UniProtKB/Swiss-Prot annotation:
GO molecular function: rRNA binding; structural constituent of ribosome
Species assigned in the record: Psychrobacter arcticus (strain DSM 17307 / VKM B-2377 / 273-4)
Protein name: Large ribosomal subunit protein uL4
Annotated spans, Disordered: 45-64
InterPro entries: Ribosomal_uL4, Ribosomal_uL4-like, Ribosomal_uL4_dom_sf
Family of the protein in this entry: Belongs to the universal ribosomal protein uL4 family.
GO cellular component, as recorded: ribonucleoprotein complex; ribosome
PANTHER family found in the cross-reference section: 50S RIBOSOMAL PROTEIN L4 (PTHR10746), LARGE RIBOSOMAL SUBUNIT PROTEIN UL4M (PTHR10746:SF6)
Alphabetical UniProt keywords: Ribonucleoprotein, Ribosomal protein, RNA-binding, rRNA-binding
HAMAP family xref list: Ribosomal_uL4_B (MF_01328_B)
Gene: rplD
GO terms (BP aspect): translation
Subunit and partners: Part of the 50S ribosomal subunit.
Function of the protein: One of the primary rRNA binding proteins, this protein initially binds near the 5'-end of the 23S rRNA. It is important during the early stages of 50S assembly. It makes multiple contacts with different domains of the 23S rRNA in the assembled 50S subunit and ribosome.
């Protein structure tokens, strides 16, 4: 597959990594698994057995005219336990390496088809200057973008840190969710070659 950078230079990339047909079910499964794995899963509520107190019967069974009650910690009482209390849970799902690789191939290929992937020889700033980076992004027509480089340049990272809807990642940090989340993905040729190596 032949792609062109912003300056018009031709870049040849593998069809396996960047030309795969889009498989919506696969991408959905991998993205869902990734988001599920990001959940903390630490929420905890108390059942009637775990709430403090409520051991004694509040009033006798018969003769009071009131509804029968065995504990002041019943789920229908104020201050009682939860009927179906949430417990800590591991939400992570297993994703095979082959599936993950396939989903990444599908996403990258779809970004190219939708013209959301912008290839550049390199993207850098002379210092941690946000204004300079904003000007470069506007020049590329991508004010809201994910910038992917082979290695994160500290100046680039610091310049992008305060811009909403802009993030800088190196190839090892890129995941399916971040690729989908941004309007445009600005990728250096070196990063594209690294993806090609990893996904081909």
């Amino acid at each position: 597959m032949d792609l062109k950078t912003v300056t018009g230079a031709a870049v040849e990339l593998s069809d396996t990594a960047f030309g795969r047909e889009f498989n919506e079910a696969l991408v959905h499964q991998v993205v869902t698994a990734y988001l599920a794995g990001a959940r903390q899963g630490t929420r905890a509520q108390k059942t009637r057995a775990e709430v403090s107190g409520g051991g004694i019967k509040p009033w006798r069974q018969k003769g009071t005219g009131r509804a029968r009650a065995g504990s002041i910690r019943s789920p229908i009482w104020r201050g009682g336990g939860r009927a179906f209390a949430a417990k800590p849970q591991d939400w992570s799902q297993k994703v095979n390496r082959k599936m993950y690789r396939g989903a990444m191939q599908c996403i990258l290929a779809e970004l190219i088809r939708q013209e959301r992937l912008i290839l550049v020889e390199e993207i850098s700033v002379s210092g941690p200057k946000t204004k300079e980076l904003i000007a470069k992004l506007n020049e590329l027509g991508a004010p809201r973008a994910l910038i992917v480089t082979k290695e994160v340049d500290e100046n680039l990272y610091l310049a992008a840190r305060n811009i909403p809807h802009v993030n800088v990642l190196d190839t090892s940090e890129v995941d399916p969710v971040s690729l989908i989340a941004f309007d445009k993905v600005i990728m250096s040729v070196e990063a594209a070659k690294q993806f090609e190596e990893a996904l081909a």
